[in-house]
Protein backbone atom coordinates (compact mmCIF):
# COMPACT_ATOMS: atom_id res chain seq x y z
CA UNK A 1 0.00 0.00 0.00
CA UNK A 2 1.21 3.52 -0.81
CA UNK A 3 2.28 5.88 1.96
CA UNK A 4 -0.60 7.67 3.67
CA UNK A 5 1.23 11.00 3.47
CA UNK A 6 2.52 11.17 -0.10
CA UNK A 7 0.67 11.35 -3.42
CA UNK A 8 -2.72 11.09 -1.79
CA UNK A 9 -5.79 11.15 -4.01
CA UNK A 10 -9.33 10.01 -3.51
CA UNK A 11 -12.78 10.65 -2.08
CA UNK A 12 -14.04 12.71 0.86
CA UNK A 13 -17.37 11.85 2.46
CA UNK A 14 -17.43 15.29 4.00
CA UNK A 15 -20.60 17.08 2.94
CA UNK A 16 -23.73 18.26 4.72
CA UNK A 17 -27.18 16.74 4.31
CA UNK A 18 -26.27 13.23 3.18
CA UNK A 19 -24.59 10.18 4.64
CA UNK A 20 -23.69 6.95 2.84
CA UNK A 21 -24.65 3.42 3.81
CA UNK A 22 -21.83 0.93 4.29
CA UNK A 23 -22.58 -0.85 0.99
CA UNK A 24 -22.35 2.52 -0.77
CA UNK A 25 -18.96 3.18 0.84
CA UNK A 26 -17.76 -0.21 -0.32
CA UNK A 27 -18.84 0.74 -3.85
CA UNK A 28 -16.75 3.90 -3.64
CA UNK A 29 -13.54 2.16 -2.54
CA UNK A 30 -13.92 -0.37 -5.36
CA UNK A 31 -14.20 2.52 -7.80
CA UNK A 32 -11.18 4.23 -6.19
CA UNK A 33 -9.14 1.10 -6.76
CA UNK A 34 -10.35 0.82 -10.36
CA UNK A 35 -9.34 4.45 -10.99
CA UNK A 36 -5.95 4.00 -9.26
CA UNK A 37 -6.91 6.39 -6.47
CA UNK A 38 -5.78 5.47 -3.00
CA UNK A 39 -7.69 7.16 -0.16
CA UNK A 40 -11.18 7.38 1.37
CA UNK A 41 -11.79 10.08 3.99
CA UNK A 42 -14.75 9.50 6.32
CA UNK A 43 -16.05 12.76 7.82
CA UNK A 44 -19.76 13.29 7.04
CA UNK A 45 -21.12 16.35 8.82
CA UNK A 46 -24.40 14.53 9.48
CA UNK A 47 -22.78 11.78 11.55
CA UNK A 48 -23.69 13.04 15.03
CA UNK A 49 -20.83 11.20 16.73
CA UNK A 50 -18.34 12.67 14.30
CA UNK A 51 -19.23 16.29 15.05
CA UNK A 52 -22.15 17.45 17.21
CA UNK A 53 -21.95 14.60 19.75
CA UNK A 54 -18.27 13.84 19.20
CA UNK A 55 -17.70 12.83 22.83
CA UNK A 56 -20.06 9.86 22.49
CA UNK A 57 -18.64 6.45 21.64
CA UNK A 58 -19.68 4.63 18.50
CA UNK A 59 -21.57 1.41 19.22
CA UNK A 60 -20.06 -2.01 18.57
CA UNK A 61 -22.17 -2.62 15.47
CA UNK A 62 -20.92 0.59 13.83
CA UNK A 63 -17.31 -0.11 14.83
CA UNK A 64 -17.55 -3.61 13.40
CA UNK A 65 -18.83 -2.16 10.12
CA UNK A 66 -15.95 0.35 10.03
CA UNK A 67 -13.47 -2.43 10.77
CA UNK A 68 -14.87 -4.49 7.89
CA UNK A 69 -14.69 -1.41 5.65
CA UNK A 70 -11.07 -0.68 6.58
CA UNK A 71 -10.08 -4.31 5.99
CA UNK A 72 -11.79 -4.35 2.60
CA UNK A 73 -10.09 -1.09 1.66
CA UNK A 74 -6.68 -2.37 2.71
CA UNK A 75 -7.09 -5.47 0.54
CA UNK A 76 -7.42 -3.24 -2.54
CA UNK A 77 -4.73 -0.71 -1.53
CA UNK A 78 -7.06 2.06 -0.37
CA UNK A 79 -6.26 3.97 2.82
CA UNK A 80 -9.08 5.04 5.13
CA UNK A 81 -8.86 8.37 6.96
CA UNK A 82 -11.39 9.02 9.73
CA UNK A 83 -12.18 12.50 10.99
CA UNK A 84 -13.12 13.82 14.42
CA UNK A 85 -14.65 17.30 14.54
CA UNK A 86 -14.76 18.55 18.17
CA UNK A 87 -14.46 22.27 17.50
CA UNK A 88 -18.09 23.32 18.00
CA UNK A 89 -17.86 22.94 21.76
CA UNK A 90 -14.37 21.70 22.66
CA UNK A 91 -13.10 23.24 25.91
CA UNK A 92 -9.40 23.94 26.20
CA UNK A 93 -9.94 24.53 29.92
CA UNK A 94 -11.20 21.05 30.78
CA UNK A 95 -8.74 18.16 30.70
CA UNK A 96 -11.54 15.62 30.35
CA UNK A 97 -12.28 16.97 26.87
CA UNK A 98 -8.78 16.02 25.76
CA UNK A 99 -9.28 12.62 27.39
CA UNK A 100 -12.53 12.26 25.42
CA UNK A 101 -10.71 13.18 22.21
CA UNK A 102 -7.98 10.59 22.79
CA UNK A 103 -10.59 7.97 23.64
CA UNK A 104 -12.52 8.65 20.43
CA UNK A 105 -9.34 8.60 18.32
CA UNK A 106 -8.16 5.32 19.85
CA UNK A 107 -11.59 3.80 19.29
CA UNK A 108 -11.43 4.71 15.60
CA UNK A 109 -7.82 3.59 15.23
CA UNK A 110 -8.71 0.20 16.73
CA UNK A 111 -10.89 -0.51 13.69
CA UNK A 112 -7.97 -0.28 11.29
CA UNK A 113 -8.27 3.34 10.16
CA UNK A 114 -5.05 4.46 8.48
CA UNK A 115 -5.00 7.97 9.95
CA UNK A 116 -7.01 10.22 12.24
CA UNK A 117 -7.93 13.68 10.97
CA UNK A 118 -8.60 16.42 13.54
CA UNK A 119 -11.06 18.90 12.03
CA UNK A 120 -11.77 22.54 12.91
CA UNK A 121 -13.65 23.49 9.74
CA UNK A 122 -16.97 25.36 9.77
CA UNK A 123 -16.90 26.44 13.41
CA UNK A 124 -17.15 29.92 14.95
CA UNK A 125 -13.92 31.58 16.09
CA UNK A 126 -12.79 30.47 19.54
CA UNK A 127 -12.84 33.34 22.00
CA UNK A 128 -9.34 32.90 23.37
CA UNK A 129 -9.93 35.69 25.88
CA UNK A 130 -11.78 33.13 28.01
CA UNK A 131 -8.69 30.92 28.03
CA UNK A 132 -6.57 31.64 31.09
CA UNK A 133 -3.41 31.01 29.09
CA UNK A 134 -4.40 33.83 26.70
CA UNK A 135 -3.17 31.88 23.69
CA UNK A 136 -4.38 32.63 20.19
CA UNK A 137 -6.96 30.41 18.53
CA UNK A 138 -4.51 29.24 15.88
CA UNK A 139 -1.94 28.30 18.51
CA UNK A 140 -4.52 26.39 20.55
CA UNK A 141 -5.70 24.40 17.52
CA UNK A 142 -2.12 23.56 16.51
CA UNK A 143 -1.16 22.51 20.03
CA UNK A 144 -4.23 20.30 20.30
CA UNK A 145 -3.26 18.58 17.05
CA UNK A 146 0.30 18.16 18.33
CA UNK A 147 -0.91 16.72 21.64
CA UNK A 148 -3.25 14.27 19.93
CA UNK A 149 -0.46 13.14 17.61
CA UNK A 150 1.83 12.55 20.59
CA UNK A 151 -0.88 10.71 22.53
CA UNK A 152 -1.49 8.39 19.57
CA UNK A 153 2.26 7.97 18.96
CA UNK A 154 1.75 8.64 15.26
CA UNK A 155 1.29 11.42 12.74
CA UNK A 156 -2.20 12.75 12.17
CA UNK A 157 -3.86 15.06 9.63
CA UNK A 158 -5.63 18.31 10.43
CA UNK A 159 -8.16 20.70 8.88
CA UNK A 160 -7.63 24.25 10.25
CA UNK A 161 -10.53 26.60 10.89
CA UNK A 162 -9.19 28.87 8.14
CA UNK A 163 -9.06 26.31 5.33
CA UNK A 164 -9.15 28.73 2.37
CA UNK A 165 -7.64 32.13 1.59
CA UNK A 166 -11.11 33.63 1.18
CA UNK A 167 -11.84 32.95 4.87
CA UNK A 168 -8.94 35.16 5.96
CA UNK A 169 -10.25 38.42 7.39
CA UNK A 170 -8.34 41.67 7.86
CA UNK A 171 -5.70 41.43 10.58
CA UNK A 172 -6.42 37.71 10.97
CA UNK A 173 -3.33 35.91 12.29
CA UNK A 174 -4.96 32.48 12.67
CA UNK A 175 -2.98 30.70 9.94
CA UNK A 176 0.30 32.31 10.94
CA UNK A 177 -0.11 31.21 14.56
CA UNK A 178 -1.48 27.81 13.57
CA UNK A 179 1.35 26.99 11.19
CA UNK A 180 4.06 28.39 13.47
CA UNK A 181 3.05 26.03 16.28
CA UNK A 182 2.04 22.93 14.30
CA UNK A 183 4.47 20.01 14.31
CA UNK A 184 6.05 19.56 10.89
CA UNK A 185 5.01 15.91 10.62
CA UNK A 186 1.29 16.79 10.61
CA UNK A 187 -0.41 17.01 7.21
CA UNK A 188 -2.83 19.89 6.48
CA UNK A 189 -5.99 19.88 4.35
CA UNK A 190 -6.57 23.18 2.50
CA UNK A 191 -8.94 24.36 -0.26
CA UNK A 192 -6.69 26.98 -1.87
CA UNK A 193 -7.54 30.58 -2.73
CA UNK A 194 -11.28 29.89 -2.68
CA UNK A 195 -13.48 27.34 -0.95
CA UNK A 196 -14.25 26.21 -4.50
CA UNK A 197 -10.96 26.99 -6.20
CA UNK A 198 -10.50 27.46 -9.94
CA UNK A 199 -7.53 25.09 -10.05
CA UNK A 200 -5.43 22.78 -7.89
CA UNK A 201 -2.11 24.18 -9.09
CA UNK A 202 0.63 24.82 -6.55
CA UNK A 203 -0.04 28.55 -6.86
CA UNK A 204 -3.35 27.97 -5.04
CA UNK A 205 -1.32 27.38 -1.89
CA UNK A 206 0.90 30.47 -2.07
CA UNK A 207 -0.66 32.14 1.00
CA UNK A 208 -0.48 29.16 3.34
CA UNK A 209 2.97 28.25 2.01
CA UNK A 210 4.29 31.56 3.34
CA UNK A 211 3.98 30.26 6.89
CA UNK A 212 4.38 26.47 6.66
CA UNK A 213 6.44 23.74 5.06
CA UNK A 214 4.03 21.02 6.18
CA UNK A 215 2.67 18.56 3.65
CA UNK A 216 -0.64 19.89 2.23
CA UNK A 217 -3.53 18.01 0.62
CA UNK A 218 -5.87 19.95 -1.64
CA UNK A 219 -9.51 19.60 -0.50
CA UNK A 220 -11.44 19.97 -3.76
CA UNK A 221 -15.07 21.16 -3.56
CA UNK A 222 -15.53 21.51 -7.33
CA UNK A 223 -18.54 19.17 -7.44
CA UNK A 224 -19.92 19.87 -3.95
CA UNK A 225 -23.53 21.05 -3.92
CA UNK A 226 -24.51 20.96 -0.24
CA UNK A 227 -24.35 24.77 -0.23
CA UNK A 228 -26.83 24.95 -3.16
CA UNK A 229 -28.90 21.74 -3.03
CA UNK A 230 -31.12 22.74 -5.94
CA UNK A 231 -28.14 22.47 -8.29
CA UNK A 232 -25.98 19.59 -9.49
CA UNK A 233 -22.45 19.95 -10.88
CA UNK A 234 -21.39 17.22 -13.27
CA UNK A 235 -19.41 19.05 -15.95
CA UNK A 236 -15.74 18.74 -16.93
CA UNK A 237 -13.06 18.58 -14.23
CA UNK A 238 -12.08 22.17 -15.00
CA UNK A 239 -8.67 23.60 -14.09
CA UNK A 240 -7.18 20.37 -12.82
CA UNK A 241 -4.42 18.67 -14.79
CA UNK A 242 -3.37 16.21 -12.08
CA UNK A 243 -5.04 14.44 -9.19
CA UNK A 244 -2.11 14.05 -6.79
CA UNK A 245 -2.38 15.28 -3.22
CA UNK A 246 -5.98 16.13 -4.09
CA UNK A 247 -9.18 14.70 -2.66
CA UNK A 248 -12.65 15.37 -4.04
CA UNK A 249 -15.62 16.21 -1.79
CA UNK A 250 -18.61 15.73 -4.14
CA UNK A 251 -22.36 15.19 -3.70
CA UNK A 252 -23.23 12.20 -1.51
CA UNK A 253 -25.33 10.78 -4.36
CA UNK A 254 -23.79 7.35 -4.85
CA UNK A 255 -24.32 6.85 -8.59
CA UNK A 256 -23.36 10.45 -9.31
CA UNK A 257 -20.20 10.25 -7.24
CA UNK A 258 -19.13 7.00 -8.89
CA UNK A 259 -19.55 8.82 -12.21
CA UNK A 260 -17.54 11.79 -10.91
CA UNK A 261 -14.61 9.50 -10.08
CA UNK A 262 -14.73 8.16 -13.64
CA UNK A 263 -14.95 11.72 -14.90
CA UNK A 264 -11.87 12.79 -12.93
CA UNK A 265 -9.90 9.76 -14.06
CA UNK A 266 -10.65 10.47 -17.72
CA UNK A 267 -10.23 14.23 -17.43
CA UNK A 268 -6.75 14.10 -15.96
CA UNK A 269 -5.87 11.61 -18.71
CA UNK A 270 -6.80 14.30 -21.28
CA UNK A 271 -9.74 12.27 -22.58
CA UNK A 272 -13.14 13.72 -23.43
CA UNK A 273 -15.20 14.11 -20.25
CA UNK A 274 -18.21 12.88 -22.22
CA UNK A 275 -16.65 9.42 -22.15
CA UNK A 276 -17.38 9.24 -18.44
CA UNK A 277 -21.01 10.17 -19.02
CA UNK A 278 -21.31 7.63 -21.82
CA UNK A 279 -19.81 4.88 -19.67
CA UNK A 280 -22.48 5.62 -17.07
CA UNK A 281 -25.37 5.55 -19.55
CA UNK A 282 -26.12 9.28 -19.86
CA UNK A 283 -28.12 9.92 -23.09
CA UNK A 284 -27.01 12.27 -25.86
CA UNK A 285 -29.90 14.61 -24.97
CA UNK A 286 -28.02 15.64 -21.84
CA UNK A 287 -25.41 17.47 -23.92
CA UNK A 288 -28.08 19.93 -25.05
CA UNK A 289 -28.46 21.15 -21.47
CA UNK A 290 -25.08 20.15 -20.00
CA UNK A 291 -23.95 23.77 -19.58
CA UNK A 292 -26.36 24.13 -16.68
CA UNK A 293 -24.46 21.41 -14.82
CA UNK A 294 -20.93 22.68 -15.34
CA UNK A 295 -18.86 23.69 -12.29
CA UNK A 296 -19.23 27.31 -11.23
CA UNK A 297 -15.85 28.35 -12.64
CA UNK A 298 -16.77 27.21 -16.18
CA UNK A 299 -18.64 30.41 -17.08
CA UNK A 300 -15.58 32.45 -16.12
CA UNK A 301 -13.65 30.66 -18.85
CA UNK A 302 -16.52 30.46 -21.38
CA UNK A 303 -18.52 33.69 -21.36
CA UNK A 304 -20.32 33.08 -24.65
CA UNK A 305 -22.90 30.33 -24.24
CA UNK A 306 -25.80 29.77 -26.62
CA UNK A 307 -29.36 29.19 -25.40
CA UNK A 308 -32.18 27.51 -27.28
CA UNK A 309 -35.20 27.38 -25.00
CA UNK A 310 -37.37 24.99 -27.00
CA UNK A 311 -34.57 22.53 -27.73
CA UNK A 312 -33.59 22.56 -24.07
CA UNK A 313 -37.14 21.91 -22.89
CA UNK A 314 -37.43 19.08 -25.40
CA UNK A 315 -34.18 17.54 -24.11
CA UNK A 316 -35.30 17.93 -20.51
CA UNK A 317 -38.61 16.22 -21.25
CA UNK A 318 -36.73 13.25 -22.71
CA UNK A 319 -34.40 13.04 -19.72
CA UNK A 320 -37.25 13.40 -17.23
CA UNK A 321 -39.77 11.01 -18.74
CA UNK A 322 -37.88 8.54 -20.95
CA UNK A 323 -34.45 8.08 -19.33
CA UNK A 324 -34.93 5.58 -16.51
CA UNK A 325 -31.85 4.36 -14.59
CA UNK A 326 -30.52 4.56 -11.04
CA UNK A 327 -28.50 7.59 -12.11
CA UNK A 328 -31.50 9.31 -13.69
CA UNK A 329 -33.44 8.90 -10.46
CA UNK A 330 -30.72 10.79 -8.60
CA UNK A 331 -30.79 13.55 -11.21
CA UNK A 332 -34.58 13.79 -11.51
CA UNK A 333 -35.13 16.64 -9.01
CA UNK A 334 -32.31 18.71 -10.52
CA UNK A 335 -33.61 18.22 -14.05
CA UNK A 336 -37.16 19.13 -13.02
CA UNK A 337 -36.06 22.22 -11.09
CA UNK A 338 -34.04 23.33 -14.12
CA UNK A 339 -37.05 22.89 -16.40
CA UNK A 340 -39.26 24.91 -14.07
CA UNK A 341 -36.66 27.68 -13.76
CA UNK A 342 -36.29 27.90 -17.54
CA UNK A 343 -40.07 28.03 -17.95
CA UNK A 344 -40.30 30.78 -15.35
CA UNK A 345 -37.49 32.73 -16.99
CA UNK A 346 -39.26 32.49 -20.35
CA UNK A 347 -42.66 33.44 -18.90
CA UNK A 348 -43.93 29.98 -19.76
CA UNK A 349 -45.62 29.10 -16.44
CA UNK A 350 -49.21 30.07 -15.73
CA UNK A 351 -50.28 31.28 -12.29
CA UNK A 352 -51.83 27.93 -11.31
CA UNK A 353 -48.60 26.07 -12.04
CA UNK A 354 -46.58 28.67 -10.15
CA UNK A 355 -48.83 28.18 -7.11
CA UNK A 356 -48.20 24.44 -7.26
CA UNK A 357 -44.42 24.45 -7.48
CA UNK A 358 -43.35 27.43 -5.37
CA UNK A 359 -43.96 28.10 -1.65
CA UNK A 360 -46.95 30.38 -1.03
CA UNK A 361 -44.98 33.60 -0.30
CA UNK A 362 -42.80 33.10 -3.39
CA UNK A 363 -45.70 32.15 -5.66
CA UNK A 364 -47.60 35.27 -4.58
CA UNK A 365 -44.57 37.47 -5.24
CA UNK A 366 -43.96 35.88 -8.66
CA UNK A 367 -47.59 36.17 -9.73
CA UNK A 368 -47.74 39.77 -8.49
CA UNK A 369 -44.73 40.59 -10.66
CA UNK A 370 -46.41 38.91 -13.61
CA UNK A 371 -49.60 40.83 -12.91
CA UNK A 372 -51.65 37.63 -12.44
Residue ranges and their predicted role:
Residues 94-119, 137-151:
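An active-site-proximal structural segment forming one wall of the substrate-binding cleft
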Residues 82-84, 120, 158:
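Short beta-strands and strand-loop turn motifs
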Residues 268-372:
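C-terminal functional modules
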Amino acid sequence: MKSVTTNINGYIEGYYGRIFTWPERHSIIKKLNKCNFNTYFYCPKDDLKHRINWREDYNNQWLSALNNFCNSAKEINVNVLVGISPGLDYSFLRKNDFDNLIKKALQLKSTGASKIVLMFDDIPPYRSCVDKRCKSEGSLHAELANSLSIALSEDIFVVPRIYSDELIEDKCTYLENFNKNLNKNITIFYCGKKIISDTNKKSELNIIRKTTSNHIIFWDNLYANDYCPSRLFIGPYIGRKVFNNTMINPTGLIKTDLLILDLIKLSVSNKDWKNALKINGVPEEFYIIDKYFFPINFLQKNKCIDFDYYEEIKALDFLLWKWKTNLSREWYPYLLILKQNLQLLNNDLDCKRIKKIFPIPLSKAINNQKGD
